[in-house]
């Protein structure tokens, strides 16, 4: 789960990372009140989980509370790379002398943690990594040891920090590691980490990504979820513990197993080229236990997507046999009743496939068409979706 900047700031503060005052606002009036409370120069910052806010006009320096009101009014509701701005953060202005970069992340390729640090912050780090890779220090971090004093010293030495900021940067890096470890994050990034005119080290802009697999250790993380911006279908799927991702097509996809579902997306996209260029509408993995309730929940999510014109159920029976899947489909259609109003193409294969097909044949549901192969099912589902467009 990616956090908004204001959430990352609050998390940093809770772990002792030096930050400036920041107040989140939902309206221009709240922004003005926040600016008055903070006092002096403030920065109005759009709260979206995407980069490029400044270039899009989502970050403005306000010299007065009235300016904060004006800027917040302009920024709220703004679209930044497809993300609508629902909140702004009013942050205390800073006298910046130098800008640095620091991050610690999960290095999946090497099955390790990685710290990255540079004395050239405030820029797009991806550009710096390509154009001047020597300016970005990369230090492996042993998960069993973490970033202690010695490791922090190694990081700042590799990055080339000046002697006058070493102590402050080292202490801040250790506290950012504390955030990473104790909050079960997969990314903690500060860009920029700054030295102010009076010599302080501050984290001015932070990004945090939390590991959803560790949510059971952090019941407080639930309050950090962005329910306002969440896709309602994805939220509904999450409530039913379904692995669902909404896409932009017309053919709903249900399968068991991520690999099979991804393959199904490919064959549907290919088949769609012959049928009006229709595309998959979603990724939905119901997992191994395709019970009637699970199937009903999956169908309910997909059928509530107005873009969906047909549904392709592609299941390979393994631990869950095809007859159990077929019974689940039949019962799911009974549960959904009239809300099941779009054609379904069902392809079953694997364990007890003949019995599964017999159950669907005898049920003789008017919306269900069976397919013998995945290619046949994808072609039929694409054809039906195109006809319904």
UniProtKB/Swiss-Prot annotation:
UniProt EC number: 6.2.1.5
Name of the protein described by the UniProt record: Succinate--CoA ligase [ADP-forming] subunit beta
InterPro entries reported in the protein's UniProt record: ATP-grasp, ATP-grasp_succ-CoA_synth-type, ATP_grasp_subdomain_1, Succ-CoA_synthase_bsu_CS, SUCC_ACL_C, Succ_CoA_ligase-like_bsu, Succinyl-CoA_synth-like
Pfam families per the UniProt record, alphabetical: ATP-grasp_2 (PF08442), Ligase_CoA (PF00549)
Top-rank taxon, per record: Bacteria
GO cellular component, one term: cytosol
Reaction(s) catalysed by this chain's protein: succinate + ATP + CoA = succinyl-CoA + ADP + phosphate; GTP + succinate + CoA = succinyl-CoA + GDP + phosphate
Binding site for substrate: 256, 318-320
Cofactor: Mg(2+)
GO annotation terms (biological process): succinyl-CoA metabolic process; tricarboxylic acid cycle
UniProt family annotation: Belongs to the succinate/malate CoA ligase beta subunit family.
Keyword Nucleotide-binding: yes
Pathway: Carbohydrate metabolism; tricarboxylic acid cycle; succinate from succinyl-CoA (ligase route): step 1/1
Subunit structure: Heterotetramer of two alpha and two beta subunits.
Domain ATP-grasp, chain residue ranges per copy: 9-236
Gene3D superfamilies: ATP-grasp fold, A domain, ATP-grasp fold, B domain, Succinyl-CoA synthetase domains
Protein biosynthesis as UniProt keyword: no
Function (record text): Succinyl-CoA synthetase functions in the citric acid cycle (TCA), coupling the hydrolysis of succinyl-CoA to the synthesis of either ATP or GTP and thus represents the only step of substrate-level phosphorylation in the TCA. The beta subunit provides nucleotide specificity of the enzyme and binds the substrate succinate, while the binding sites for coenzyme A and phosphate are found in the alpha subunit.
Taxonomic source organism: Renibacterium salmoninarum (strain ATCC 33209 / DSM 20767 / JCM 11484 / NBRC 15589 / NCIMB 2235)
Keywords: ATP-binding, Ligase, Magnesium, Metal-binding, Nucleotide-binding, Tricarboxylic acid cycle
Gene Ontology MF annotations: ATP binding; magnesium ion binding; succinate-CoA ligase (ADP-forming) activity; succinate-CoA ligase (GDP-forming) activity
S-S bridge residues: none
